[in-house]
Amino acid sequence: MAAGAVFLALSAQLLQARLMKEESPVVSWWLEPEDGTAL
């Protein structure tokens, strides 16, 4: 259930960023990790 909660939190973060058209540090890190690896 923890994984589901994390997934929902990330989805909500991405949705909010799209609606507000602002990039939060979390979204930027999620889409473009500094180490160049995909989660």
From Swiss-Prot:
Secreted is among the record's keywords: yes
Protein name: B melanoma antigen 4
Species the sequence originates in: Homo sapiens
Similarity comment text for this entry: Belongs to the BAGE family.
GO CC entries: extracellular region
Intracellular or extracellular location(s): Secreted
Expression sites by tissue: Not expressed in normal tissues except in testis. Expressed in melanoma, bladder and lung carcinomas.
Encoding gene (name): BAGE4
Top-level taxon of the source organism: Eukaryota
Pfam families documented for this protein: BAGE
Functional summary from the UniProt entry: Unknown. Candidate gene encoding tumor antigens.
Keyword field contains Signal: yes
